[in-house]
């Protein structure tokens, strides 16, 4: 999906995110540039670095959602990290590299799941044979044979008997029809209970995780644990085991490392919290500047050692975000500013935006509540004037207290629908219409009392 044109990317983002057209255009261009880079001759390809982006705007306006939807749309490795995670006391530089290690871990799992999906059919067939072997064990015969020291018995497992074959096929049909789903069978499950050992080096107590299972691989003895499980669950367990045996983990890791290096996106949230405003070099500001210095090589391009191998960060796209209430982007160190050449200011949400957020996206808030109540047989209907009233109250509370953007709508909706959600299983009226009067009656008293609105809405 990375070959989508910028206009198509924006159209896809519009299905889930209201407004913020400027930000959508920039992230769409950044994604398209990835595709363009791959079309460039090899000698120049390595020289073209991604243009990292800083999204500036208050909370709840769509900064994280834009990045997350972009990654999902393009099906690329994505990781969200908080910049404040790297400001703890005793912070050392290697901790910044943990986000690359986490991204690799996420990508390996992503690629492995896709590979397992591709071998799902043969894995299911193999699992089915193993289930049938449990339900109808192969016939065992013992035959005597003579060796140098005398006569010994030889056990032969046969599966060629025609009666047994026909019984096996009958069992297979019953298995397919689900007649054995609730029957319990004894299943031996392989487990490797190997300890994870953390080694702390003398260079700033940097944490390096070594797993004996990874180091020794097949040398570690397999512990098998016998469990009594339903046939339906046994089928899932055995299918997973067979799939793991069919995929080549070396190929998975190689593909995952390549995807991280070429397509990875890291969303660095709350970068404004590590910006140094006003008096520099005092107290925690020293730590914040240190964090920026440690982030710099990762963002500009370095090689990070992970348990799967070395990863170059030169072409990973970094999208940073922050509200910048107390600080400005210019409070970041000049070197780090230079690594984020694109700055996009997101707009605060208007009352009209709130109305659209409630009804238009594919995952619209009102649609979510309607679908939830539909499971109880309750039809929930919102009139147009109720939508306008909810948007108006959310905007007013945001203006009077803390501006938390679209997240305020969830709070308002929960307060509005509290009684309906509670009484839904017993309510006799299966069609409930929410009008503006009901919204005002339910929320007006809370909205007017500033103390209550601060704590409830």
UniProtKB/Swiss-Prot annotation:
Q: What keywords is this UniProt entry annotated with?
A: ATP-binding, Chaperone, Cytoplasm, Nucleotide-binding, Stress response
The alphabetized list of GO BP terms reads: protein unfolding; proteolysis involved in protein catabolic process
Q: Which gene encodes it?
A: hslU
What Gene Ontology molecular-function terms does this entry list? ATP binding; ATP hydrolysis activity; peptidase activity; proteasome-activating activity
Q: What is this protein called?
A: ATP-dependent protease ATPase subunit HslU
Q: Which family does it belong to?
A: Belongs to the ClpX chaperone family. HslU subfamily.
SMART domains under this entry? AAA, ClpB_D2-small
What is the predominant subcellular site recorded for this chain? cytoplasm
Record's subunit section: A double ring-shaped homohexamer of HslV is capped on each side by a ring-shaped HslU homohexamer. The assembly of the HslU/HslV complex is dependent on binding of ATP.
Name the residues that bind ATP: 18, 60-65, 269, 335, 407
- UniProt function note: ATPase subunit of a proteasome-like degradation complex; this subunit has chaperone activity. The binding of ATP and its subsequent hydrolysis by HslU are essential for unfolding of protein substrates subsequently hydrolyzed by HslV. HslU recognizes the N-terminal part of its protein substrates and unfolds these before they are guided to HslV for hydrolysis.
């Amino acid at each position: 999906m990375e070959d989508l044109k910028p206009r198509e990317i924006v159209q896809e983002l519009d299905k889930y995110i209201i407004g913020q057209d400027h930000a959508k255009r920039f992230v769409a261009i950044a994604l398209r540039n990835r595709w363009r880079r791959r079309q460039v001759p090899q000698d120049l390809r390595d020289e073209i670095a991604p243009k990292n982006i800083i999204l500036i705007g208050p909370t709840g306006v769509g900064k994280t959602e834009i990045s997350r939807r972009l990654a999902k749309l393009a099906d690329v490795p994505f990781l969200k990290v908080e910049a404040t995670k790297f400001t703890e006391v005793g912070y050392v530089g290697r901790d910044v590299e943990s986000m690359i290690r986490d991204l690799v871990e996420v990508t390996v799992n992503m690629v492995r799941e896709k590979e397992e999906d591709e071998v799902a059919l043969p894995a299911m067939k193999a699992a089915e044979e193993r289930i049938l072997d449990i339900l109808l064990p192969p016939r065992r015969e013992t035959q005597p044979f003579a060796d140098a020291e005398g006569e010994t018995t030889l056990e032969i497992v046969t599966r060629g008997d025609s009666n047994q074959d026909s019984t096996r096929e009958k069992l297979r049909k019953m298995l397919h029809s689900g007649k054995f789903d609730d029957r319990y069978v004894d299943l031996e499950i392989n487990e490797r209970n190997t300890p994870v050992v953390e080694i702390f080096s003398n260079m700033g107590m940097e944490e390096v995780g070594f797993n004996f299972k990874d180091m020794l691989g097949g040398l570690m003895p397999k512990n098998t644990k016998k469990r009594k499980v339903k046939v339906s669950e046994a089928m899932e367990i055995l299918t997973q085991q067979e799939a793991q045996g069919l995929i080549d983990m070396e190929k998975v890791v190689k593909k995952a490392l390549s995807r991280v290096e070429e397509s990875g996106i890291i969303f660095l949230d709350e970068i404004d919290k590590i910006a140094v405003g006003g008096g520099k070099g005092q107290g925690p500001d020293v730590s914040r500047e240190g964090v920026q210095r440690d982030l710099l090589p990762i963002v500009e391009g370095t090689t990070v050692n992970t348990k799967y191998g070395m990863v170059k960060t030169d072409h990973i796209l970094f999208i940073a975000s922050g509200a910048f209430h107390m600080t400005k982007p210019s409070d970041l160190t000049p070197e780090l500013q230079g690594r984020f050449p694109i700055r996009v200011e997101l707009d605060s949400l208007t009352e009209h935006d709130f109305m659209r957020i409630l009804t238009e996206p594919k995952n619209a808030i009102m649609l979510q509540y309607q679908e939830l109540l539909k499971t109880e047989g309750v039809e929930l209907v919102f009139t147009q004037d109720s939508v306008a009233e909810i948007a108006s109250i959310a905007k007013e509370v945001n203006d009077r207290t803390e501006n938390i953007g679209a997240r305020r709508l969830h709070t308002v909706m929960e307060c509005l629908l509290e009684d309906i959600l509670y009484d839904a299983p017993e309510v006799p009226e299966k069609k409930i219409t929410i009008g503006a009067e009901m919204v005002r009656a339910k929320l007006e008293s809370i909205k007017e009392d500033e103390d209550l609105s601060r704590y409830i809405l």
